[in-house]
């Protein structure tokens, strides 16, 4: 590990004399001052823990990026490692639980100003909330190739995407042809706002997602809305039709911030209103107010407001910084716990991070 870091550091120093290089790192620790678990026969109480949240697959420990006028690349170290199957040359999946590994590899280049190619880890999404940056109507985040054309506010991206080290097209002898993800994304921005379209084909064109969206900034208010349909098909069965929409609202002025996001989706209209209907209404909101020593906030999230049991996450606390060190401390209540969904969990989580 030391040898790898040394090589990367030397490469970064050498790179600065040739093109723009950026090396960023982040040290983040998460813990709990108190945890009360009421899901057991007798309430369990524990206190004072610290560690690293390995579930934050989006949070790199170390990121290196280089760029020139018309090209660039980046690679990221994350907590976790690639798992291998019987064939040691094949990466089977990312394991969050142990070690440090290189997960994100990206290269881009522009033969001409309006044309851009991305290879490696690529992603695309409809409008996305900025409370947790993890919720949107449709998206993909995989490995592949993407070509993008941009001019005068118009953007068109076409991408072939699939799992790591997987072929987009394959056909065994005397077998059926199999294709993975094909995505087309277009957007146009002007004074009236930005309109977008998202179409994704997967599983040999049997799984289809299509959406249209709009977003705009009205002074201190940002609004967006998306509506889409999906067709979930298999080789031997009829396709299942679903549809949904999402709405985002954000207000930020001076010390005040409020954001809310809602997403409704029906995955299968054939069972609409029946037992086992997968329809859901996802909702989250956050309010914060900046003071001199810290920022106070209240947070609410429920993954399905239409569920029979009230299962939500409620947070109230503060965030702040001392120099480059950021801290967060809050009380958290999780409802809907236990086998019957009638228990709660109470905790006081803390986190500390320094980015450099």
Which stretches of residues belong to each language-model region?
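Transmembrane beta-strand segments of Gram-negative outer membrane beta-barrel proteins
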Residues: 20-42, 117
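Sequence/structural signature of outer-membrane beta-barrel proteins
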Residues: 32-41, 78-92, 122-134, 161-177, ...
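Outer-membrane beta-barrel strand-turn architecture
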Residues: 67-70, 111-113, 150-155, 188-192, ...
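Outer-membrane beta-barrel "beta-signal"
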Residues: 322, 343-356
């Amino acid at each position: 590990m030391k040898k790898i870091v040394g090589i990367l550091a030397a490469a970064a120093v050498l790179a600065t004399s040739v093109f723009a290089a950026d090396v960023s790192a982040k040290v983040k620790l998460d813990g709990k001052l108190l945890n009360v678990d009421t899901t057991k026969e007798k309430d369990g109480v524990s206190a004072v823990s610290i560690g690293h949240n390995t579930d934050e697959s989006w949070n790199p420990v170390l990121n290196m990026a280089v760029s020139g006028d018309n090209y660039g690349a980046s690679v990221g170290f994350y907590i976790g490692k690639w798992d291998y199957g019987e064939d040691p040359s094949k990466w089977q999946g990312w394991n969050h639980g142990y070690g440090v590994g290189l997960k994100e590899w990206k290269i881009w280049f522009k033969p001409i100003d309006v044309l851009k190619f991305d290879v490696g880890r690529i992603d695309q999404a409809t409008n996305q909330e900025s409370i947790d940056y993890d919720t949107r109507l449709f998206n993909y985040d995989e490995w592949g190739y993407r070509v993008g054309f941009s001019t005068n506010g118009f953007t068109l991206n076409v991408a072939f995407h699939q799992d790591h080290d997987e072929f987009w097209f394959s056909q065994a002898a005397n077998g059926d042809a199999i294709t993975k993800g094909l995505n087309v994304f277009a957007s146009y921005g002007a004074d009236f706002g930005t309109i977008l379209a998202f179409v994704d084909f997967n599983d040999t064109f049997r799984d289809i997602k299509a959406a249209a969206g709009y977003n705009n900034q009205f002074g201190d208010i940002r609004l967006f809305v998306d509506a889409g349909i999906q067709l979930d098909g298999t080789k031997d069965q009829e396709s299942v039709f679903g549809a949904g929409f999402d709405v985002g609202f954000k207000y930020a002025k001076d010390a005040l911030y409020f954001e809310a996001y809602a997403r409704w989706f029906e995955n299968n209209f054939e069972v609409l209103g029946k037992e086992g209907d997968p329809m859901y209404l996802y909702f989250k909101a956050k309010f914060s107010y900046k003071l001199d020593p810290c920022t106070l906030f209240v947070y609410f999230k429920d993954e399905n407001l239409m569920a029979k049991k009230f299962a939500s996450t409620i947070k109230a606390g503060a965030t702040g910084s001392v120099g480059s060190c950021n801290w967060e401390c809050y009380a958290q209540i999780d409802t809907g716990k236990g086998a019957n969904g009638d228990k709660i969990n109470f905790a006081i989580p803390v986190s500390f991070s320094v980015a450099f």
